[in-house]
């Protein structure tokens, strides 16, 4: 199943010594980042973000809520991030027409 693109992209810098800049634009990418690349996995916001991405991928919550969980985890881990409009996202109306 393909994850829906978020309306906004999260540009995230993770890591302490040599931070890596990542472009995350959907819940699947966020889950992969959290599970495979996230150095600090021992706080509540991280766990909420993992669960949020999982629930979004199952269709239980919106993908936009998963994005918010990711940003909260980044804040708690003191990782820099910026948010920009996702030029690749498709509105619900456009998706229904297609």
Residue ranges and their predicted role:
Residues 54-91:
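Short, compact, well-ordered microdomains
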Residues 14, 24, 61, 65-68, ...:
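Weak global preference for isoleucine
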Residues 24-26, 48, 67, 84, ...:
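General "foldedness" signal
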Residues 1-51:
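The feature represents the first ordered module of a protein
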